[in-house]
Design a protein with these regions (language model features):
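Short, glycine- and charge-enriched coil/turn segments that flank and shape catalytic ligand pockets
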Residues: 10-12, 359-360
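Generic recognition of cysteine residues
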Residues: 136, 265-266, 346
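Catalytic-core region of carbohydrate-active enzymes that cleave or remodel glycosidic bonds
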Residues: 236-318
Length: 402
């Protein structure tokens, strides 16, 4: 394809720049069919506050639709659902509330209202197109305080209990049994997971006991440090950048159909997607996920906007841009678009690896894997810490060549 780009402006003569583009005769599958498991956590509460619309109203869903569609269009797999009040305390401008109403009746029995949860999940599945996994956070919050409406006192009360305590097991066990029933009635049980993040191993062990006692078929997920003792119980385990699954464990998890990914958060100076990060780091990060043998990538926030996100991307002590990469509007960002570029490259690599292996093109496959190996902590050091922009550009050139 050939064309001309005209550059014009005040006080200078227009310039004509000829250009030529060669389009490779290949197409990618639809994003939801990509092999990469993408998990960027959504915050519906931030959208309601920013647009000043009532929570879960038509106006709220209308405001969320184009934002969430941006995620579906790049292969997002998981729906972020909060099943308790403030699962992460106040680590976002707009705290997450419980999408499930709990009431303790006068006779001591419990009833649950799933109206909001159902609306959110149905919206994300049917209108947005994200439907692989419903991640329900969390049974182990930062503050071990659990809300419910008490009919006897006609007010919201809180139970303070830690994993391993009888009150904790009663509160969660009763709920999970009813939640399992509801999910099965909706046809969502197989897609739903009880999810935790960055919690101590002993607390996780106790929570797992409660989950399995309520329904042994519940899926469980964790974003946190690798613990050999519990990894087998985790359908989906995401570990921090710089950590690796033992090879035999990763192979066994893959055989069982379990998901194993990598995540970055506010901790990693490199690679990341902060406002001040080199934009190519976003692409580098997801290429690293493939290079490291992970199934995908998780990040804890994609639209947890601070007070004035179009003017100031800082939030308290978090690095600027840590809490979002999609802006109100919705507006994309350079770092989000570079992430998309990386995701597309990951799918190209997946396709090429299969094709080259099927053809017995071992030389080309070795060349591709050698270039990809640079996108690991040790591989990057061997390149003398080459700039991410140059590394991603070189990978693009190789993919186009192949």
């Amino acid at each position: 394809y050939k064309g001309t780009l005209t550059v014009s402006g005040k006080n200078f003569e227009a310039m004509k720049l000829p250009f030529e583009i060669e389009v490779v005769n290949r197409t990618l599958p639809e994003p939801q069919k990509w092999a990469f498991h993408l998990d960027l956590w959504q915050n519906p509460y931030a959208v309601a506050r920013y647009y000043q619309v009532p929570l879960w109203s038509k106006e709220h869903f209308d405001a969320m639709r184009p934002i969430m569609k941006m995620l579906a269009n790049v292969g997002q797999r998981a729906i972020t659902a909060s099943i308790m009040h403030k699962p992460w305390a106040g680590q976002t401008e707009d705290h997450y509330d419980s999408m499930i109403f709990r009431m303790k009746k006068l006779d001591g029995t419990w009833v649950y209202d799933y109206t909001v949860f159902d609306k959110w999940v149905e919206f994300m599945m049917n209108e947005v197109g994200i439907k692989d996994l419903i991640s329900c956070y969390t049974m182990i919050p930062w503050a071990l305080s659990f809300d419910y409406f008490d009919q006897a006192t006609n007010r919201v009360q809180f139970i303070k209990a830690a994993p391993g305590e009888e009150a904790y097991a009663e509160y969660w066990g009763t709920f999970l049994k009813d939640f399992s029933r509801h999910l099965r009635e909706k046809g969502w049980f197989e897609k739903t997971a009880i999810s935790m993040d960055e919690r101590p191993m002993e607390a996780m062990r106790e929570a797992i006991k409660v989950i399995k006692a309520a329904d042994p078929e519940f899926k469980i997920t964790l974003a946190g440090n690798y613990h050999e003792e519990i990894q087998g119980d985790l359908y989906y385990l995401s570990i921090p950048y710089g950590n690796q699954f033992p090879e035999e464990v990763k192979a066994e998890r893959e055989r069982k159909g379990q998901i194993s990914t990598v995540y970055t958060c506010c901790t990693e100076a490199f690679p990341n997607t902060f406002t001040f990060s080199e934009p190519a780091e976003a692409a580098w990060t997801v290429l690293h996920a493939v290079a490291g043998g992970y199934d995908g990538y998780l990040r804890w926030a994609v639209n947890s906007w601070p007070m004035d996100p179009l003017r100031d991307s800082r939030f308290r002590t978090w690095a600027a841009g840590d809490t979002y990469s999609i802006y109100p509007g919705p507006r994309s960002s350079i770092r989000f678009e570079r992430l998309v570029e990386g995701l597309q490259d990951c799918e190209k690599i997946h396709i090429l690896r299969e094709e080259l292996a099927a053809k017995g093109a071992n030389g080309k496959l070795k060349k591709l894997n050698a270039k990809l190996s640079e996108f690991t902590p040790e591989g990057w050091i061997k390149t003398n810490k080459k700039s991410p922009a140059k590394m991603v550009s070189e990978m693009n050139a190789l993919l186009n060549e192949m």
